[in-house]
Design a protein with these regions (language model features):
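Preference for long, amphipathic alpha-helical scaffolds in soluble/luminal domains
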Residues: 1-202
Length: 202
């Protein structure tokens, strides 16, 4: 309980991400880099707190719910918790479903408020989270999550289509703003693109 899904027979997960699913490997790397078993305990306790504070609709908080939910979901996925995990599976699936519903409702756009010029942050972080969920849950452990593939495809494609002509991304997804983009926005979008690539989806 609280140890995440595990197993060595998970070739669907890129090798860069696979080690998170081995408790022994995770603990070994933790100890070798100055951590302790208490660090792992603290992480599990934090995940339990997140589970306890999750909203009934699968989101977290009452502000910027899409972004906050995506960040919370990424913490579970980072511990190799999937929709099928014994202790946290319900929380993971509920969060994924919440984000899928947002994507489906908005034609791939992932944001709490599409009128807010800063919604590009939420879209990138949420796309990252959904892609990570697809790779871990579907490719890695063969879990069936309705419409997850469609959400990843549509949200990822929107991200690609909305790139600034200068190569970056900018507020409100302006494609021709004078400044050409924002470094922090670009960073999240590159992370989302990397996660989308790992899904293996075309």
């Amino acid at each position: 309980s609280g140890q995440g899904k595990s197993g060595t027979g998970i070739p669907g997960i890129p090798i860069e991400s696979r080690k998170r699913c081995s408790l022994a490997d995770r603990m070994g790397r933790l100890i070798n880099n100055g951590g302790s078993k208490e660090c792992e305990t603290a992480v599990v306790n934090a995940l339990r707190w997140l589970k306890k504070t999750q909203n009934k609709n699968g989101s977290w908080t009452n502000q910027k719910e899409v972004g906050m939910t995506s960040l919370a979901l990424l913490t579970f996925l980072g511990h190799c918790e999937t929709a099928g995990s014994e202790e946290f599976g319900d929380a993971v699936l509920s969060a994924i479903t919440y984000l899928i519903d947002i994507s489906m409702k908005n034609n791939g756009k992932l944001a709490t408020d599409l009128k807010d010029d800063h919604w590009c942050y939420e879209h990138a972080i949420a796309t990252y989270a959904l892609a990570e969920a697809y790779t871990l849950c579907v490719r890695g452990f063969g879990e069936n999550i309705s419409q997850l593939e469609e959400a990843v495809m549509s949200s990822g494609q929107f991200l690609i289509n909305s790139q600034h002509q200068g190569g970056g991304w900018d507020y409100a997804y302006s494609e021709d703003s004078a400044r050409g983009g924002d470094v922090s926005i670009v960073g999240w979008h590159l992370q989302a693109l990397k996660a989308c690539k790992f899904t293996g989806l075309d």
